[in-house]
């Protein structure tokens, strides 16, 4: 019997100091627990030799789910090994799980082998991380307060199978009366679901619908293989017991839950009062005439066996164990406790999506600076500081940098840290500390005083087009300045250079790059350069570059190039669009807000709800996603291998979608999005385990995201509330998300093994880190998780 840790990576490892006679013992670090609760795991490893007859290695029936050591691959395998077994709690394990866990298995319905993934009457969630204490599913399978497994756990139970490929689909077990004595089974396949998602309100394709009832309701039985798009299923005009809807109930505090159709007659005449009892399986409050919520259990039936686990590969541990493993670096889903916030009113007095409280964030000189349209900042203790449009906060503490007090008379739209330690500021202003600076200024990040090392000036010589600097970007020796303007001058010459809406300054001496002066016929919203500045990617409202067609985007390899070969297929084209002559298009559609170089790819975010990824080698689109109900993507930010995409969107993001208003047609799945989401920069896929919840006052969304030097993600825009670890917070203007713990714990040591009759007794020296759990691994899998420093097997 081999006790070994599963494969991880991270810190260096050391061997255990002792072992029983004839045994080789090693100790290795394990990994942090996956999921919302960041529990730690340290792995204990030992090679002890075989016990008994080694039945577990040769007889699949050994894995019957009766204990963590005998965890089965699925409820289906439990049923095959014990056909007479009853429904209840069983231990299951697949290699995608960190350790065996208990789940509720329905072994009596339709052949058995069903694992329950959620249950409840109200308060369901669409959050990928599920809801509540997962143990409550197998401990209290009929509880009314919804509990749902994390999406990561559901995917692990499937052992690599896509939900859309499950032969038996998803099973909804629903009460048919208020007493819970009659039940319906509704089975259906969600066609586009490459991974599990709780976004059941989203319009998606469902097929292979099978509805069965007890004898007295058998007239409602139904079966169809047809594919239908909707909020699960509506049974035509009848909309009765055969309909299955997942809805948000304003009459019940916007709680989510399942309902039948509006025409389902649940109680007899004059008995609707039965629905008002809190003990009813089908419930609505008194004085509520809407369709009631129905207690529902959800099941899947992955038919995974030990042979399937072996075929896909279990953990190949060496005699010395395995290296440590760390999770992907992402923020926590809960916002940090707020210390400062902006005013709810704008500093300019204007209202609109172009005048949100925070639109620009960067770090320089030990502080994070937030710029936008706000009148003052306010602390959690109630202190009000009259500082408009731009403020700084100490990186380590989040406290206001009180020495930084610039006086700016207009909205800040962009900020950028310069290598020389100065803060570049752009926007719609013309006075800074009483002096004339039109849309651009350099500040000392300690004091807020104008830094006069370089005298860089931006002007517009078109009277109807005021200066507005919307984007600043530093890359390999240059500062790129984009927005609305016609000319600018640098430090080395009083002469103004014509470089319309985009220019760059040499960071070596503050000089305008006279050899790089593109001309765009519309505002530049975003700019991002590749390494070495060989490619400069641009997004905005323009249709021309140097007189050639460049519809809303450009890939500049030569500043004198006319137009370009990078084209974008919009998610929506209005019927009145001048598609045959985009170069001279006057209607405003298809515009883009931001662009981000990401190594081998370029990301684009803009109008009509789309975010997309392009492969640099071909400039071909390889990924796209569309939000609904939602809005434009307004900001992109790269940190490591993760892209943060921000938008004015608040429900679903359809991955693979290409057209707005029919997102589900080409979608591979749908996940939730609440104003900002994380994406893998190389695959394009949403990283759904980061699932923040925030909202704003007007629906203008998030306009800036930035990861500081501590790994904390800052997001700014029209934000009024965010969900923190202790509840909803009034995070006005911006919110912060600290990095989740990804470092493996230290190595346990001094592992000893002694014989205690027919059992082996393992003991070891623990580590000092708090809340650590230890996993015991045998041969190719973990068999137990303990909080102490001993285990008997």
Please give the residue ranges for each predicted region.
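Short glycine/proline-enriched turn or capping motifs at secondary-structure junctions
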Residues: 43, 292, 727-730
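Mature extracellular or lumenal effector domains of secreted proteins
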Residues: 56-322
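Secretory targeting and sorting signals
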Residues: 2-57
């Amino acid at each position: 019997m081999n006790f070994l840790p599963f494969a991880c990576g991270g810190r260096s490892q050391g061997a255990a100091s002792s072992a029983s006679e004839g045994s080789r013992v090693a100790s290795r670090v394990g990994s942090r627990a996956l999921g919302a609760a960041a529990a730690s795991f340290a792995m204990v490893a030992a090679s002890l030799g075989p016990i008994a007859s080694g039945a577990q290695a040769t007889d699949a029936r050994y894995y019957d789910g009766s204990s963590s050591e005998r965890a089965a691959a699925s409820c289906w395998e439990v049923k095959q090994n014990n056909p007479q077994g009853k429904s209840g709690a069983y231990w299951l394990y697949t290699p995608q799980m960190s350790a065996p866990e208990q789940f509720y298995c329905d072994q009596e319905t339709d052949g058995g082998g069903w694992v329950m993934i959620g249950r409840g009457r109200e308060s369901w969630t669409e959050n990928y991380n599920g809801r509540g204490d997962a143990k409550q599913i197998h401990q209290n399978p009929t509880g009314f307060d919804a509990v749902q497994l994390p999406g990561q756990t559901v995917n692990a139970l499937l052992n690599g199978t896509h939900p859309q490929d499950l032969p038996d689909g998803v099973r909804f077990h629903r009460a048919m009366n208020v007493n819970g004595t009659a039940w319906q089974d509704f089975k259906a396949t969600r066609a586009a679901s490459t991974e599990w998602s709780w976004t059941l309100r989203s319009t998606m394709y469902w097929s292979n619908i099978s509805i069965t009832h007890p004898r007295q309701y058998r007239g409602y039985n139904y079966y169809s293989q047809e594919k239908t798009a909707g909020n699960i299923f509506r049974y035509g005009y009848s909309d009765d017991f055969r309909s299955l809807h997942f809805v948000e109930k304003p009459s019940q505090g916007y709680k989510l839950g399942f309902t039948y159709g509006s025409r389902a007659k649940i109680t007899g005449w004059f008995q609707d009062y039965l629905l008002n009892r809190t003990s009813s399986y089908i419930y609505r409050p008194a004085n509520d005439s809407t369709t009631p919520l129905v207690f529902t259990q959800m099941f899947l039936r992955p038919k995974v066996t030990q042979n399937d686990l072996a075929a896909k590969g279990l953990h190949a541990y060496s005699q010395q164990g395995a290296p440590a493993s760390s999770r992907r670096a992402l923020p926590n889903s809960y916002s940090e406790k707020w210390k400062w916030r902006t005013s709810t009113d704008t500093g300019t007095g204007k209202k609109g999506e172009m005048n949100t409280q925070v639109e620009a964030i960067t770090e320089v000189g030990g502080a994070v600076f937030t710029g936008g349209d706000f009148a003052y900042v306010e602390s959690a203790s109630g202190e009000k500081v009259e500082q408009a449009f731009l403020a700084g906060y100490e990186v380590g503490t989040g406290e206001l940098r009180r020495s930084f007090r610039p006086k700016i008379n207009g909205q800040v739209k962009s900020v950028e840290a310069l290598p020389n330690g100065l803060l570049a500021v752009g926007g719609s202003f013309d006075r800074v500390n009483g002096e004339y600076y039109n849309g651009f200024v350099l500040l000392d990040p300690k004091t807020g005083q104008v830094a006069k090392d370089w005298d860089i000036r931006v002007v517009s010589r078109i009277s109807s087009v005021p200066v507005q600097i919307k984007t600043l970007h530093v890359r390999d020796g240059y500062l790129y300045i984009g927005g609305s303007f016609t000319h600018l001058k640098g430090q080395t010459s009083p002469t103004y250079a014509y470089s319309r809406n985009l220019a760059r300054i040499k960071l070596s001496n503050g000089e305008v790059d006279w050899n790089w002066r593109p001309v765009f016929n519309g505002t530049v919203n975003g700019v991002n350069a590749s390494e070495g500045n060989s490619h400069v990617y641009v997004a905005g409202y323009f249709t021309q570059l140097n007189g050639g067609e460049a519809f809303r985007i450009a890939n500049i390899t030569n500043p004198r190039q006319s137009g370009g070969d990078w084209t974008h297929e919009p998610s929506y084209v209005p019927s009145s669009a001048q598609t045959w002559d985009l170069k001279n298009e006057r209607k405003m559609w298809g515009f883009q807000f931001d662009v981000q170089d990401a190594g081998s790819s370029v990301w684009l975010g803009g109008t009509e709800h789309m975010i997309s990824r392009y492969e640099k080698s071909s400039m071909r689109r390889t990924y796209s996603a569309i939000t609904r109900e939602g809005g434009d993507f307004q900001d992109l930010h790269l940190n490591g291998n993760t892209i943060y995409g921000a938008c004015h969107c608040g429900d679903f993001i359809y991955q693979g979608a290409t057209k707005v208003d029919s997102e589900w047609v080409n979608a591979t799945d749908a996940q939730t999005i609440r104003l900002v989401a994380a994406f893998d920069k190389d695959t394009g896929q949403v990283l759904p385990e980061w699932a923040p919840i925030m909202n704003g006052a007007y629906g203008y969304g998030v306009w800036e995201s930035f990861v500081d030097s501590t790994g904390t993600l800052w997001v700014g825009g029209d934000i009024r509330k965010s969900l923190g670890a202790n509840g909803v917070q009034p995070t006005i203007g911006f919110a912060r998300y600290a990095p989740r713990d990804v470092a493996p714990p230290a190595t346990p040591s001094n592992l000893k093994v002694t014989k205690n009759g027919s059992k082996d007794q393992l003991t070891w020296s623990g580590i000092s880190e708090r809340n650590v759990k230890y996993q015991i691994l045998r041969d190719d899998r973990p068999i137990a998780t303990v909080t102490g420093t001993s285990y008997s097997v």
